C-alpha cells in the first residue's frame, strides 16, 4: 500500500530466461545462444535472469514488497514462454495473475490457448495485431475469442506505436504493419464478443483519439495507463498526462481505467516513478479517493478475480 492506496499493477512484463532465449533464436545469422545473450545484456545494460522462473518470481515478490505493492498482472511477452508465467502464478497466486502472448498464425493456436486458459488458469491473452500482421477483427480469430469468452478471460490488444526494447537490444528488426494498429478495428469485435473484457494498453500508444472512440462505443473495453506514455510528444495535440487522464475519465469513467507501469527489465525492476507520478497526479486533479482506489487496484482485481 502506498499511502492510502493499494496497487495492483495491470502491466508488468515477466522477462524470463526462456523469453530471452526464444528471442535470440529468432535472430538471423546469430552466434551461439550464450554469446547472443551476453551481447543483448551488454547492449541494453540489462540483466538476463537465471533459468528458474520461480526464482525470478521470488525476486519480483521481493521487489514489490520493497515498494509496498500488493499484486502484479504478469505478461508472458512472447509465444512459447507461457510456462514461465504459469510457474510464477502457481507459486505466488495471491501476488500474481498471468496473461500470455499468442501468435495468431501458429498451427497450435487453439490447442495451446485452451491449455493455458483452462488447465493452467491464466487470465487471458495478449494480441499484437501490427506485429503479427493480422487485423483484430479477422474472422480467423473468432474461435479464439469464443474460447476466451467461455473462460471469462481478458484480451489485451496493443494498438498504435509498438516499442519492443528487447528486440532492439538483440538486433532483431521490429517489422509492423500500421494498417492493423487502429483501435477502432476493435469496435465490431467488442460488440460481437460482449462477454470479453478488452483492454487497450498505454492509452492507445499514440492512437488516443481512436481509443476514446472505442470507449464511447463499447462498455466492455478498458484502457491501461502504462509506462512513460512517450507517445504524447508525437501526438498532434501534444497533450500532457493530466489532459490524457481528464479525457479518458470523461469517456471511460473511473471504472474502466487500469493503472499499469510497463515494468519488466532487470536490474531496474519496478518503475516506481510511474506509480508515484500517476498517484500524485490523480490527487492533484482531485479525483475522488474512491475513484483512485478503483484505478490503482479495484478494477484490475475485479477483472482478474471475477468479482
What are these model-derived regions, one by one?
Residues 32, 36-52, 157-179, 264:
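Glycine-rich phosphate-binding "P-loop"
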Residues 123-124, 137-258:
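Catalytic pocket-lining loop regions of alpha/beta-barrel enzymes
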Residues 11, 64, 85, 125, ...:
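Conserved, mostly hydrophobic/aromatic
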Residues 15-17, 79-81, 105-108, 161-165, ...:
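Active-site environment of divalent metal-dependent phosphoester hydrolases
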Residues 7-10, 74-75, 99, 126, ...:
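Active-site neighborhood of phospho(di)ester-bond hydrolases with catalytic His/Asp-centered motifs
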Residues 57-61, 82-89, 113-114, 141, ...:
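Generic structural signal for well-ordered alpha-helices
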Residues 1-66, 71, 247, 252-256, ...:
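Mid-to-C-terminal alpha-helical segments outside catalytic/metal-binding sites
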Residues 70-71, 78-168, 173-177:
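Active-site gating/metal-coordination segments in enzymes
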Amino acid at each position: 500500500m502506498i499511502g492510502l492506496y493499494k496497487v495492483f499493477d495491470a502491466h508488468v512484463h515477466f522477462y524470463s530466461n526462456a523469453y530471452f532465449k526464444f528471442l535470440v533464436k529468432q535472430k538471423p545469422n546469430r552466434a551461439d545462444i550464450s554469446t547472443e545473450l551476453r551481447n543483448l545484456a551488454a547492449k541494453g545494460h540489462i540483466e538476463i535472469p537465471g533459468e528458474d522462473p520461480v526464482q525470478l518470481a521470488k525476486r519480483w515478490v521481493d521487489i514489490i514488497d520493497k515498494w509496498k505493492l500488493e499484486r502484479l498482472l504478469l505478461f508472458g511477452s512472447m509465444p512459447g514462454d507461457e510456462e514461465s508465467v504459469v510457474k510464477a502464478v502457481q507459486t505466488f497466486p495471491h501476488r500474481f495473475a498471468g496473461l500470455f502472448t499468442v501468435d495468431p498464425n501458429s498451427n497450435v493456436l487453439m490447442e495451446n490457448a485452451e491449455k493455458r486458459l483452462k488447465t493452467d488458469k491464466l487470465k487471458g491473452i495478449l494480441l499484437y495485431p501490427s506485429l503479427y500482421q493480422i487485423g483484430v477483427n479477422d474472422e480467423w480469430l473468432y474461435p479464439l475469442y469464443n474460447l476466451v469468452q467461455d473462460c471469462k478471460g481478458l484480451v489485451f490488444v496493443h494498438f498504435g506505436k509498438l516499442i519492443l526494447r528487447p528486440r532492439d537490444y538483440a538486433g532483431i528488426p521490429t517489422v509492423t504493419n500500421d494498417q492493423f494498429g487502429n483501435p477502432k478495428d476493435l469496435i465490431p469485435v467488442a460488440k460481437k464478443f460482449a462477454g470479453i473484457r478488452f483492454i487497450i494498453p498505454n492509452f492507445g500508444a499514440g492512437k488516443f483519439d481512436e481509443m476514446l472512440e472505442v470507449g464511447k462505443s463499447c462498455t466492455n473495453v478498458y484502457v491501461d495507463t502504462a509506462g512513460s506514455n512517450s507517445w504524447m510528444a508525437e501526438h498532434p495535440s501534444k497533450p500532457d498526462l493530466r489532459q490524457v487522464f481528464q479525457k479518458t475519465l470523461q469517456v471511460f469513467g473511473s471504472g474502466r481505467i487500469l493503472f499499469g507501469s510497463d515494468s519488466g527489465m532487470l536490474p531496474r525492476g519496478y518503475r516506481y516513478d510511474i506509480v508515484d507520478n500517476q498517484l500524485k497526479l490523480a490527487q492533484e486533479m482531485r479525483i475522488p479517493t474512491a475513484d483512485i482506489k478503483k484505478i490503482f487496484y479495484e478494477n484490475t482485481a475485479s477483472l482478474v478475480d471475477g468479482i
